Amino acid sequence: MTLRSVCVFCGASPGASPVYQEAAVALGRHLAERGLTLVYGGGAVGLMGTVADAALAAGGEVIGIIPQSLQEAEIGHKGLTRLEVVDGMHARKARMAELADAFIALPGGLGTLEELFEVWTWGQLGYHAKPLGLLEVNGFYDPLLTFLDHLVDERFVRAEHRGMLQRGASPEALLDALAAWTPSVAPKWVDRTPQ
């Protein structure tokens, strides 16, 4: 799969450890070095601002999508290649998904998880065939991955759908995995045969 743009979901907070910001810098820089456009939530704060600043500093193109309410709160990044202001969170997610060829989640909070799970669900439902992945940073997503495996074991998620979520220990490894990903064909829902 040829990637031209990658949407990054990440926190509006820098997190408790400097390793999170270091990972955001590495990802932003690597996206720019590969000539990939960064699409993200448009914020100037937390990991959002860090990944955008790193991509811009490395000569990359950065497109931010921000809801009007957050723009009015003055957290929108003013130095982006392009900042689009939309009506609300639903429009933001839809526009980011429209512009992106792939999705990566850095560490973040509820908004990051919600964005990741929404695009993952869209992929499961066949609304898109775009790869998504987690950048492994300091074991941040390990508890979530364990829970996701539990969902498969309990037959609430198909293994094929669980397998849609790639992971990488470095930006290079993750971007290579996303570029090599091919969608698997699987029934939408878990087998409903009684046990």
UniProtKB/Swiss-Prot annotation:
<dbReference type="GO" id="GO:0016799">
    <property type="term" value="F:hydrolase activity, hydrolyzing N-glycosyl compounds"/>
</dbReference>
<feature type="binding site">
    <location>
        <begin position="92"/>
        <end position="93"/>
    </location>
    <ligand>
        <name>substrate</name>
    </ligand>
</feature>
<feature type="binding site">
    <location>
        <position position="121"/>
    </location>
    <ligand>
        <name>substrate</name>
    </ligand>
</feature>
<protein>
    <recommendedName>
        <fullName>Cytokinin riboside 5'-monophosphate phosphoribohydrolase</fullName>
        <ecNumber>3.2.2.n1</ecNumber>
        <ecNumber>3.2.2.4</ecNumber>
    </recommendedName>
</protein>
<dbReference type="GO" id="GO:0102682">
    <property type="term" value="F:cytokinin riboside 5'-monophosphate phosphoribohydrolase activity"/>
</dbReference>
<comment type="subunit">
    <text>Homodimer.</text>
</comment>
<dbReference type="InterPro" id="IPR005269">
    <property type="entry name" value="LOG"/>
</dbReference>
<keyword id="KW-0203">Cytokinin biosynthesis</keyword>
<dbReference type="GO" id="GO:0005829">
    <property type="term" value="C:cytosol"/>
</dbReference>
<dbReference type="GO" id="GO:0009691">
    <property type="term" value="P:cytokinin biosynthetic process"/>
</dbReference>
<dbReference type="GO" id="GO:0008714">
    <property type="term" value="F:AMP nucleosidase activity"/>
</dbReference>
<comment type="similarity">
    <text>Belongs to the LOG family.</text>
</comment>
<feature type="binding site">
    <location>
        <begin position="109"/>
        <end position="115"/>
    </location>
    <ligand>
        <name>substrate</name>
    </ligand>
</feature>
<dbReference type="Pfam" id="PF03641">
    <property type="entry name" value="Lysine_decarbox"/>
</dbReference>
<keyword id="KW-0378">Hydrolase</keyword>
<feature type="binding site">
    <location>
        <position position="74"/>
    </location>
    <ligand>
        <name>substrate</name>
    </ligand>
</feature>
<comment type="function">
    <text>Catalyzes the hydrolytic removal of ribose 5'-monophosphate from nitrogen N6-modified adenosines, the final step of bioactive cytokinin synthesis. Exhibits phosphoribohydrolase activity against AMP in vitro.</text>
</comment>
<dbReference type="InterPro" id="IPR031100">
    <property type="entry name" value="LOG_fam"/>
</dbReference>
